[in-house]
Design a protein with these regions (language model features):
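Transmembrane helix-loop junctions in multi-pass membrane proteins
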Residues: 18-28, 59-64, 147-162, 243-257, ...
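Hydrophobic core segments of alpha-helical transmembrane domains in multi-pass membrane transport
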Residues: 6-19, 49-57, 142, 149-153, ...
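Membrane-embedded alpha-helical segments and adjacent helix-loop junctions characteristic
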Residues: 24-120, 307-392
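Alpha-helical transmembrane segments of integral membrane proteins, especially early/N-terminal helices
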Residues: 1-13, 59-69, 134, 139, ...
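Hydrophobic transmembrane alpha-helices of multi-pass small-molecule transporters
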Residues: 1-41, 199-327, 454-457
């Protein structure tokens, strides 16, 4: 399916560009997106990948990943029946889903790539996506969001009266998109057109063949001593105290930290944080997102060290894979983003808007949302620009702006996710993953419009 979509984007871009006199824009779009794929996405991702793969190595060697997978075994076994309950992929997928829920994009992508690498160890047809890979991608493109931070930030920057009004609508919409994605991927995996034929592996070019990934079960770590348990309890209590102090008494927390900051850095001025004025539930979610990364970066090495793991050596061993993964995804990123850039430069998005507007307007779908909805599966940065322009033009408190913010927070750049995740393990036959991801996006869009009409009118 991905072959036909890619060919359609490229061919239509050339035809539309030739018919409308925009071939120069088509060429510029191709070159700009090729440069972006390498210089602004793949290479910066290498450092982030190295960090989180190193941290995941510590979690794996200390036995934390296995414990997390065991705790969620009943749910994960139903979603991924082809993956053994004690397989490392279970823990990697759980970590990725948790990061997505908290809006930790810098952590979610490396953890998701690690999960794909673990799932590849179970793949009997290299180059072809397994059912577990397709299910994981469908969940990833529709993951439940507790706090759509980017959409809220854009609404707040345009002086919305209540920029956090979309938190509830985005949460409900992501539930709908997740359910739709899971149902779609499970229903389509046995369709004849998507079924994997026994022994039929996709042809994989030697230049992109993934390295063999042995299933490494870490040795049993040393038992946690009593004083080690006390140290972990103290560490957790410290973060719990920070969390509740900021959530329950944010003004006192900011005053105390500002006083300490002035004592240590007397020449700097501390600006008051905006979270103090937010409602308590939003402060709780915001503080959870803020503390999550520092907690993980501190807890995993501490736990591993207390269980006898050589933390520096194991971190470096895990981080070694980061650059290799970034290199492997470059051809797939270039292919997808170049096609998107050409189609957008040719005016294909505007043409689709003109064709679909007469059909969707009678159904209560605002035509102003169409460009953003059409671009969303293709490009995150372009969607951000379109959303910002829409908010500026219609007002941040308009119904359409709130619909757009809800859509932004409940959908995903499906083709980018496919290129990065499948590219990391050289999967060329995506099977039903694309269709399931787009169905999840469509469900998120429809749910966003309906929920916003019910809540804001």
């Amino acid at each position: 399916m991905l072959n036909y979509l890619w060919l359609a984007l490229v061919t239509l871009a050339v035809l539309i560009g030739g018919a409308t006199g925009r071939l120069r824009e088509v060429t510029e779009g191709a070159f700009q997106m090729a440069d972006m794929a390498v210089m602004k996405i793949a290479l910066p991702l290498a450092g982030i990948m190295a960090l989180w793969l190193g941290v995941m190595r510590l979690a794996e060697q200390s036995g934390l990943v296995q414990k997390l997978a065991a705790a969620l075994r009943p749910l994960m076994s139903r979603l991924f029946p082809d993956v053994p309950a004690d397989h490392p992929a279970m823990g990697s997928m759980v970590m990725n889903m948790a990061a997505n829920m908290l809006g930790l994009a810098n952590a979610a992508t490396p953890l998701g790539l690690r999960a794909m690498r673990d799932l590849e160890t179970l793949n009997r047809t290299p180059g072809t996506a397994t059912n577990a890979m397709c299910t994981f991608l469908a969940i990833n493109t529709s993951s439940i969001q507790l706090l759509p931070t980017t959409a809220i930030a854009i609404l707040a920057s345009q002086h919305a009266q209540d920029p956090t009004a979309i938190v509830g609508t985005a949460f409900l919409a992501t539930i709908c998109s997740t359910v739709a994605g899971v149902v779609a991927v499970k229903a389509m995996q046995n369709w004849p057109m998507f079924r994997v034929q026994p022994g039929a592996a996709a042809a994989v070019s030697p230049s992109v063949t993934p390295d063999p990934i042995p299933l490494r079960l870490p040795p049993a770590p040393a038992p946690l001593p009593a004083w080690g348990r006390a140290a972990l309890i103290l560490f957790i209590a410290l973060f719990a105290g920070l969390f509740f102090w900021q959530v329950i008494a944010p003004t006192a927390y900011q005053a105390s930290t500002a006083h300490l900051h002035r004592a240590i850095f007397p020449s700097t001025v501390v600006a008051p944080a905006a979270e103090a004025a937010a409602p308590l539930p939003l402060r709780a979610i915001g503080m959870l997102s803020l503390l999550a990364v520092p907690f993980l970066l501190g807890f995993f090495p501490l736990y591993a060290a207390l269980r006898g793991v050589k933390v520096y050596e194991e971190f470096v061993e895990g981080a070694k894979e980061g650059f290799g993964v970034a290199l492997r995804i470059i051809p797939f990123l270039v292919a997808i983003l170049v096609a998107v850039g050409m189609f957008r430069g040719a005016g294909g998005i505007e043409a689709l808007k003109s064709a679909l507007a007469p059909l969707l307007t009678p159904l209560g779908f605002p035509p102003d949302l169409l460009p953003m909805v059409l671009v969303r599966p293709l490009s995150g940065s372009a969607t951000t620009g379109l959303f910002t322009e829409l908010v500026q033009r219609l007002g941040p408190d308009s119904l359409t702006a709130r619909m757009a913010g809800t859509i932004f927070g409940s959908t995903e750049t499906t083709f980018y996710v496919i290129a990065v995740y499948f590219g990391s393990v050289a999967v060329q036959r995506a099977r039903h993953a694309v269709a399931a991801g787009l169905i999840a996006d469509l469900a998120g869009v429809v749910a966003s419009v309906i929920i916003c009409r019910l809540m804001f009118t």
